[in-house]
């Protein structure tokens, strides 16, 4: 009998999609279906919040933050 997995359709930038694909290669926890080459994925509904938190942490580390003014 077929099993159904609840999924959520997400649209993201190609760079973010590449990060999600990398995560999924490690453990196959996130992606139900890769729909196209650019922006669309179906993500397991149960893993959506976990994925958002993990992406947030990684992007915070990689995005350059403007330095505070030294004149203050």
Curated annotation (Swiss-Prot):
BP term (GO), one: transcription initiation at RNA polymerase II promoter
Major localisation: nucleus
DNA repair listed as a keyword: yes
Signal peptide (UniProt feature, chain positions): none
Function: Component of the general transcription and DNA repair factor IIH (TFIIH) core complex, which is involved in general and transcription-coupled nucleotide excision repair (NER) of damaged DNA and, when complexed to TFIIK, in RNA transcription by RNA polymerase II. In NER, TFIIH acts by opening DNA around the lesion to allow the excision of the damaged oligonucleotide and its replacement by a new DNA fragment. In transcription, TFIIH has an essential role in transcription initiation.
Family label: Belongs to the TFB5 family.
Protein's UniProt name: General transcription and DNA repair factor IIH subunit tfb5
Species of the source: Aspergillus fumigatus (strain ATCC MYA-4609 / CBS 101355 / FGSC A1100 / Af293)
Gene that produces this protein: tfb5
């Amino acid at each position: 009998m077929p099993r159904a997995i609840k999924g959520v359709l997400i649209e993201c930038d190609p760079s973010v999609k590449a990060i999600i694909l990398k995560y999924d290669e490690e453990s196959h926890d996130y992606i139900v279906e890769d729909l196209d080459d650019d922006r669309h994925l179906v993500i397991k509904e149960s893993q959506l919040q976990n994925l958002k938190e993990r992406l947030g942490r990684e992007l915070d580390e990689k995005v350059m933050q403007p330095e505070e003014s030294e004149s203050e």
